[in-house]
Amino acid sequence: MRTKAVLLLATAIWMHVFAADATDVERIRLQSRDAVLEVTPALGGRVLAFGLAGHPSLINIGDPVASQPNPAVSATADDIGYLGHDVWLGPQSGWWSDQQVNAARHDARAVWPPDPYLAFAQTRVVARAPDRLVLEGIDSPVTGVRLLKSFAFDPADPATLELSALARNIRDRPVSRDLWFNTRTSAAIRVYVPVATDADVRIEAAEAMAPAWRSDAGVFAFLPPSTAGASRRGKVLMQPSAGWMAGFAHRQAFVIRFDLQPRSAIHPQQGQVELYLDHGEDIAAGLLEMEVHAPYRTLAPGEAMRASERWTVLAYDGADTPQAHLAFLCRRLQLCAVSTAD
């Protein structure tokens, strides 16, 4: 599901503290009273850093951000492990089956790499302020859309950032897609997702590599590997019971909120929340993707669809246990109870 270009995990920059390399891509910094965001208009308009001011970034990026800042944009391009946060179009099974610019990938119904026009192209800065940024991408002949991405701190809550993506159909015929947010973090982050039952969780992984997990009191969480040095690689697809997920790392609580959707609105091959986990013996050098799918829709020519996430980051100085983490979420953000979407 991921190529070796993505799996540059040992060299992924987990402890990045909002400092650019001389050969790095351009970075635009947005800042509120509490938090800092860094976005590059290169690489499709990608988030490179987010966290509390003066703290390590919660976003994982790869060495190619500095070593390959100007990738070629073409229908034959392969994936490059920039990581960060970006936006894909789902479902994955349709990435190359509805295009005419790469026959080999079309005929193979390829599910990798992601659309290079969305992932690699330079975007245009449409609006910019100290706490707000809007970027417009280019027309993609692969997915048939153009993306408009917006980032803005909430003036009423300086710990919260709203991210939105608008996809417009640029073709002269309908296209069927969903908007898919993908936020890369370290595999060492302690992540939680509310689920009503275990039946709302499915695993895609080889049995020997499948991540261990449990749901307790309506919340999904990964379990530590049962043996030292164990490697894990796989995807968890979930129908959440509430519109949030959260992670804890580096004395920060990172909460992603979104509009909860009924199962029927999400493409059946996907989950509204997906977690992709990949790590070897050094878990902190591994990768966790925190992913959210918006409803699957058919767009008429020229029609657009929009989806958004709200990111909140708070200082956390409690114990590194699930009980303490969940108590903090309930106390500080009222993320306590779960409900069924269907």
Residue ranges of model-derived segments:
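Bacterial N-terminal signal peptides
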Residues: 6-16
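Positively charged n-region of N-terminal signal peptides that target proteins for export
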Residues: 1-5
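Surface-exposed acidic/polar loop and edge beta-strand patches at domain peripheries
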Residues: 20-162, 166, 170-342
